[in-house]
């Protein structure tokens, strides 16, 4: 079983695979007891194995995730989906904790800083730790088409478009690495994908950088505390319900 760190640190409040939370605990107390040391997202072996198998079966993971992707967490946090969150977390943490739990789950993946700035801040204040799960480099949409990855800005203009080839890179995160076949690809030279798909986990997780060494750790280097998360642009309500339920169930059910 692979444990994937997504955001960090919500142990006593039973956010993200924590323990000890009960439905009778006041929300205010729960939030104040949040720690900054044990946040893990634990994916089920079945889901993860299926995602990895899809890539292998097709000969290449990248070719199996074709589509256009937007940032995940701005979509997850839209007001129209709030009740889905509340309905999902209430059975696990109680109605009195549902709002605070939802805010915390979302907030731990929506930090506005990463890299050395984040490392310095979190070293001084571990309880403030969170991950930046936004797209970087001005990209608002990623288009995956076979071996080609394209990034578009807010106006739909192309920022980059390169063909990528798979690499065999051993890394602590279990990510799948790709390298641009074009010279001077800048911060889009290397991509590292978690073996997710819209069919299995209803989202993608990936990182990219000019230096492959920056993609080896979530907690060190120029991209520390950054892990981009995307969802298919044409997702529907059922997909949104599925990803929220999966996220909540895998991160809170152990507290039951």
Question: Language-model segments: which ranges?
Answer:
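Positively charged n-region of N-terminal signal peptides that target proteins for export
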Residues: 1-10
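Bacterial N-terminal signal peptides
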Residues: 9-18
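Polar/charged side chains located within well-ordered beta-strands of beta-rich proteins
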Residues: 14, 69, 203-207
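Bacterial lipoprotein signal-peptidase II cleavage site
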Residues: 18-30
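Intrinsically disordered, low-complexity serine/threonine-rich repeat tracts
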Residues: 27-53
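N-terminal helix-cap/turn-to-beta initiation motif at the start of protein domains
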Residues: 52-70
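Short, solvent-exposed loop/hinge segments that bridge or flank secondary-structure elements
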Residues: 59, 70-147, 189-199, 256
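Calycin-type beta-barrel ligand-binding domains and close structural analogs
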Residues: 122-256
């Amino acid at each position: 079983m692979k444990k994937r760190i997504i955001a960090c640190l919500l142990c006593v409040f039973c956010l993200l695979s924590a323990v000890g939370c009960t439905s009778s605990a006041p929300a205010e107390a729960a939030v104040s007891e949040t720690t900054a040391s044990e946040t893990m997202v634990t994916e089920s072996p079945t889901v993860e194995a299926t995602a990895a198998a899809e890539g292998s079966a097709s000969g290449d993971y990248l070719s199996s995730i074709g589509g256009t992707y937007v940032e995940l967490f701005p979509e997850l946090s839209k007001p129209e989906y709030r009740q889905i969150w509340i309905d999902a977390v209430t059975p696990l943490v109680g109605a009195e904790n549902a709002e605070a739990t939802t805010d915390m789950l979302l907030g731990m993946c929506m930090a506005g800083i990463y890299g050395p700035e984040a490392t310095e801040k979190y070293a001084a204040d571990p309880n403030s730790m969170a991950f930046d799960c936004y797209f970087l480099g001005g990209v608002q949409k990623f288009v995956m088409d076979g071996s080609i990855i394209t990034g578009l800005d807010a106006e739909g203009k192309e920022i980059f478009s390169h063909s990528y080839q798979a690499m065999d890179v051993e890394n602590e995160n279990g990510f799948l690495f790709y390298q641009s076949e074009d010279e001077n690809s800048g911060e889009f030279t290397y991509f590292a994908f978690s073996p997710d798909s819209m069919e299995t986990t209803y989202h993608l997780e990936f990182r990219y950088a000019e230096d492959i060494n920056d993609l080896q750790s979530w907690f060190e280097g120029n991209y520390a505390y950054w892990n981009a998360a995307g969802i298919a642009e044409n997702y529907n309500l059922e997909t949104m319900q599925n990803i929220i339920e999966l996220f909540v169930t895998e991160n809170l059910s152990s507290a039951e």
